[in-house]
Amino acid sequence: MVKLTNPPKSPKELGFDEFPSIGIIGGSGLYDPGIFENAVEVQIHTPYGLPSDNVIVGRVAGRVVAFLPRHGRGHKYPPHKIPYRANIYSLYMLGVRSIVAVSAVGSLRPDYAPGDFVVPDQFVDMTKGREYTFYDGPRTCHIQIGLEPFTQEIRQILIETAKKYNRTHDGGCYVCIEGPRFSTKAESRIWREVFGCDIIGMTLVPEINLARELGMCYGLIALVTDYDIWVPHQPVTAEAVEKMMTEKLGIIKKVIAEAVPKLPAELPKCSETLKYACV
């Protein structure tokens, strides 16, 4: 195991000839992608504490890639307790500049069925008490990601790849709730009928905010596991979520393994997020 308290000065400290420019964040059920060659575990102490688990660094189709399980192996952290800042900063310290995240979500519309993939293009934040920014002062920055919160180039690669293996929807609005409880019927009706959202989850925010604050590109492939609570006699349960993730895990790994080598290492439009953001 490699232990770090500062960004590595050379990729040789990790046992590779280049830094991992691509990062994968695994969601519920995806604690080890099982697609790496020459994998090494890296324990990273960040200014924001330890991430949810050690970062795994290895090669995928020749590219050096980093992987971090969002909840930690064994699902140690519920959504509202995930160390989001440490997670994102640990990947940034290793050289990651583009992130592909995987999440389980509920569907808020009938045509986004359990078992489908969704590659969202917008989100609504309904979380309440998380650490949302790296800029708590004395420097203040207001990032503008509203037009394209999810990086289009990453989205397109995920969509094209996922469609080969599974029914996949291009676009959708993800409403992120605080959790860890699921929605009430009244809340679910608001997300669907008032907000016009398409999928619901608990982990996108502040993960996406933090990545974009550091100039990182970000894309998400979401697996629909349930219909939230709005379909009669089909209320969501943790058991149902876990069961669907287990059924689709092999396909998710195939999509990641095929998509990752095609991803851009870095895009100027992502790194320029802070260009006019700080006051």
UniProtKB/Swiss-Prot annotation:
Residues binding phosphate, per UniProt = 28, 70-71, 103-104, 203
Q: Site described as Important for substrate specificity, positions?
A: 183, 238
Q: What Pfam families does this protein's entry cite?
A: PNP_UDP_1 (PF01048)
UniProt pathway? Amino-acid biosynthesis; L-methionine biosynthesis via salvage pathway; S-methyl-5-thio-alpha-D-ribose 1-phosphate from S-methyl-5'-thioadenosine (phosphorylase route): step 1/1
Write down the CDD domains for this protein, in alphabetical order.
Answer: MTAP_SsMTAPII_like_MTIP
The Gene Ontology biological process terms listed for this entry are: L-methionine salvage from methylthioadenosine; purine ribonucleoside salvage
Looking at the UniProt record for this protein, which Gene Ontology cellular component terms does it annotate, in alphabetical order?
cytosol
Q: Does the keyword Glycosyltransferase apply?
A: yes
Q: Where does substrate bind?
A: 202, 226-228
EC code(s) of this entry: 2.4.2.28
Q: How does it assemble?
A: Homohexamer. Dimer of a homotrimer.
Query: What family does the database annotate?
Result: Belongs to the PNP/MTAP phosphorylase family. MTAP subfamily.
- The protein's name is S-methyl-5'-thioadenosine phosphorylase
Organism equals Pyrobaculum aerophilum (strain ATCC 51768 / DSM 7523 / JCM 9630 / CIP 104966 / NBRC 100827 / IM2)
Its gene is mtnP
